[in-house]
């Protein structure tokens, strides 16, 4: 074992370069290499190699993009069309709640903003009765030192949608008796497919923090007291916060998934994110590592869900970007090149849903969540087919 450790740590430049290439060009190879190496030499040695690879990537990107303006990835309405949108003035129809229109917030840092930063654009969806719009997208450049750092964010109307959690076929690993008996499909249930709006990745592997999960009223892995948790009630309302704030109503929750400490909670940035070199928000990789990340957030009313996936961000930039668009509480989900993604659905030629990446450049294997079983946990959104539910009080 000692020789194996020495060999792994001594791979140096070529090993780092190989890992960098693998995680950026072959979606399955990077995770496979990392998992195989962890089994041989342990997670600490692999973490150091991963951090070296991402440091190399960051240095290359900062040199390659020096002096460049940040990119916009889609067209946005011009200033006249945008007018004085507030997110609060969309008229209602009949007796339903007002139509959903998130508030445009503009750029976080004007010196690295692209055209349209912080402007919400509607996203079409496949779900039956797909009106009114329940999903919007925007782009934020959250790091004044990196013009290439970007967060793609969607906002979902929780009055007209419901969030669901699914355990992967492998992750998170179950430690309870009931969890070990639980039958995992790694798929979106057939009964929900006509109402599908979107799906996105879940949290860390069990070995990276042992963050808990409950799904279908079955606890797979017990909760950690200081972890952040996103949780669902039977009526479809959500809770998001440190487990201590969620635990008093734990018996009412049909599912929950934990993550590292809340990046933002009740509007306040975590004290550990005062510096861009924060060392948490990634057991395998430190929070200061510049890497692809994902996060989930709720606004102060509990009526708007935010999901973000990023390129080239540290934990602080991710948290501030999510907070800027309106998230009052934010939890980081998975990180690394191969895992974060947001998928939306359209009708295929057979009429069945077909998943497509909402944002280009991320990784997604065709038919995952529908026919291809997911080894990792994930979330999906469905459009409510009943009267829109009120915002939780």
Pin down the residues of each PLM region:
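Zymogen propeptides
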Residues: 2-221
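Short, solvent-exposed loop/turn segments at the edges of secondary structure
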Residues: 149, 225, 291, 372-376
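Short beta-strand scaffold segments in enzyme catalytic cores
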Residues: 152-155, 228-232, 294-298, 340-344, ...
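Short acidic-glycine loop/turn motifs at beta-strand connectors
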Residues: 156-160, 232-237, 266, 298-302, ...
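Aspartyl protease catalytic domain
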Residues: 165-324, 328
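Catalytic metal-binding/acid-base residues of hydrolase active sites
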Residues: 205, 336-338
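Active-site neighborhood of phospho(di)ester-bond hydrolases with catalytic His/Asp-centered motifs
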Residues: 330-333
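C-terminal regions of proteins
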Residues: 339-392
